[in-house]
Amino acid sequence: MKKQTVKIIVAGAAGRMGRTILSLAYRDPAIQIAGAFERADNPSVGRDVGELIGSSPINVPVHPDLRECIQSG
């Protein structure tokens, strides 16, 4: 049976819980980080998710709202 990859979008990506979820998802081959978003005034907007979790860039930027996040992914 073929294993499926679950795509996730994380809200509050720059917060403590958001970073923890992103870090755990990054290490799990069954999960693909499809997007992440934060409040528009958060300094993490525009940064790569990999930077938030202390890894190399993964080409997933932090967006300022959910709609933009969904449209990009």
What are these regions (language model features)?
Residues 13, 37-40, 65-66:
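Fold-independent oxyanion-binding glycine-rich loops
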Residues 26-54:
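NAD(P)-binding Rossmann-fold cofactor-contacting core
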Residues 1-6, 67:
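A short, basic/flexible loop-to-alpha-helix module at the beginning of a structural domain
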Residues 8-12:
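Conserved N-terminal Rossmann-fold NAD(P)-binding element of oxidoreductases
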Residues 14, 18-22:
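N-terminal Rossmann NAD(P)H-binding glycine-rich loop of SDR-like oxidoreductase domains
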Residues 7, 32-35, 59-61:
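Conserved beta-strand segments of alpha/beta enzyme cores
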Residues 51-71:
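Glycine-rich, highly charged phosphate/nucleotide-binding loops
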